[in-house]
Amino acid sequence: NDEMGFERGFGALASNEINVYWSGNTDQVKGDVYYLNIPITNNLLGTRLFFIPKGTAKDYENIYTLEDLRKSKKVGGFGRGWSDVTIWKNNNLPYLEKENGNWAAIFTMMAKKTRGIDYFSRGVIEILPEKAAIIDKNNLALEVEPNLIFKYNGDFLIYLNKKNGELNKIIESALLNAQKSGLITKTVEEFWKKDFDELNMKNRRVIIVPN
């Protein structure tokens, strides 16, 4: 999905060029596009870690609550239309919204330390792949903040086009069965165990972000 691009992906689904698109919660849904309210990673998208400029981890050592983050005046960076924007706004947390579809530019903006972005909030299952594919590959002076988890209700969802009625029924039935049987939970725990261990998830401080 990232390779296709957020806005282009929803456009392709709306025009029925593709039949299925997965993404986080968004206000970009319109027309014949709708989503299945079945979280497909057990809220891992809403389990957030921060990318930060190298050498700034000490700035987060005394953050234990949402109020601490608010008082720090640290500014988060987000792509346009992301659900995070509404959540950050409702919690009076400073943020900047990237106005075009190239959300990956936030990495370079943050690395320069001159564009007003202090951290980039990403889902826990996005962190290590993006670190390898973007940060390490481009030798950006960024790192993963080591001690915090910010958690809100949010997950990847399956988006469909209403025009594909029969196919949509098959997809929805399969996802419901996977949810009820515990297959989604089992898959999540097995597939991302190595990432969870590497990111030291069990020993991080959890801060709940209301949404």
Which residues make up each language-model segment?
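Alpha-to-beta junction loops
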Residues: 12-23, 74, 112-122
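Extracytoplasmic small-molecule ligand-binding "clamshell" domains
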Residues: 1-33, 171
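Periplasmic-binding protein-like
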Residues: 44-49, 135-172, 194-211
